A protein has these predicted regions:
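Residues lining the SAM
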Residues: 123, 127-131, 156
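Surface-exposed interaction regions that form or flank ligand-binding interfaces
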Residues: 88, 92, 232-242
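A short glycine-rich, Lys/Arg-flanked "PGG" loop and its adjoining helix->strand segment in the class I
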Residues: 137-152
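Class I SAM-dependent methyltransferase SAM/SAH-binding core
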Residues: 50-118, 124, 138-141
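Conserved catalytic/acceptor-binding region of the Class I
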Residues: 154-216, 223-237
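A short His-aromatic
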Residues: 129-134, 146
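Class I SAM-dependent methyltransferase Rossmann-like catalytic core
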Residues: 2-50
Length: 242
């Protein structure tokens, strides 16, 4: 009998969209980290022989990877996709953050667990810093659905040690969940294999960011749209004297 597939917490999708939309105007603040991880992903792509015709850039945010993918594969259709319309709208802002190399990219607003994309229509699903900390099995199943036979899934995500210092600090206050839990790489590999992905390769790198104070860290977390999205999290009201 196969071992049970690890489950991840249910998520408040409405809250997720609100948080990401709210972060759109400030998302450029954390581009340094997004571009660092994307650069490492593109280095790995150098070792893969692939000429995709259709590329889905999932959770594309401001579209930095979409731009680079369009340049790398000039004959491919690149589809930027994000659940936050506010971020997608930034692609067409008067002050463009990225060049689209003269190509018209079809932006799609949608959630990863229910993509508005036809089955077996995508050659490459790309996602940089994708939050797999919620509903991971159904999301991976959906990605398998949209991929063509022989298609490639390439993504980066955060690991369980993310914000471990902040989690330890909160544990001194109470026993509630303040930090969104992340998926272990071995569990992720099991989920991919369970959904029929062939020879999944999962590796890990430790990236350390140092902040001068908690206030600066909180600023970047808000800019990234990072929040505890568990549907079972405690609801709190902000008080003026808190």
């Amino acid at each position: 009998m196969s071992p049970p597939i690890p489950q991840t917490p249910p998520v408040n999708f409405a809250l997720r969209r609100r948080v990401r939309n709210r972060s759109a105007a400030k998302h450029e603040q954390i581009n340094f980290f997004c571009e660092e991880i994307a650069g490492r992903m593109f280095e790995r792509l150098d070792y893969i022989k692939l000429e995709p015709r259709v590329i889905l850039d999932l959770n594309c945010a401001l579209g930095a990877s979409s731009s680079k993918l369009a340049k790398r594969f000039p004959d491919a259709l690149v589809i930027p996709c994000d659940p936050a319309f506010g971020l997608l709208r930034m692609h067409a802002a008067p002050k463009k953050l990225f060049s689209w190399f003269g190509k018209s990219l079809n932006r799609v607003c949608g959630e990863a667990h229910a993509l508005p994309i036809a089955a077996k229509s995508v050659d490459l699903v790309w996602s940089n810093l994708f939050a797999l900390s919620y509903d991971a099995p159904s999301i991976i199943r959906e990605l398998k659905r949209v991929l063509k036979p022989g298609g490639l899934l390439m993504l980066s995500t955060l690991g369980p040690d993310t914000l471990k210092e902040l989690r330890a600090a909160f544990s001194q206050v109470d026993s509630l969940s303040h930090i969104q839990p992340q998926v272990d790489m071995h569990d992720l590999g099991d989920m991919l294999a369970h959904e029929g992905f062939q020879t999944p390769v999962v590796d890990m790198e430790m990236v350390t960011l140092t902040y001068p104070d908690v206030k600066t860290l909180a600023r970047d977390l808000r800019a990234a749209g990072a929040s505890n999205l568990e549907a079972t999290r405690r609801a709190t009201k902000k008080k003026k004297n808190r």
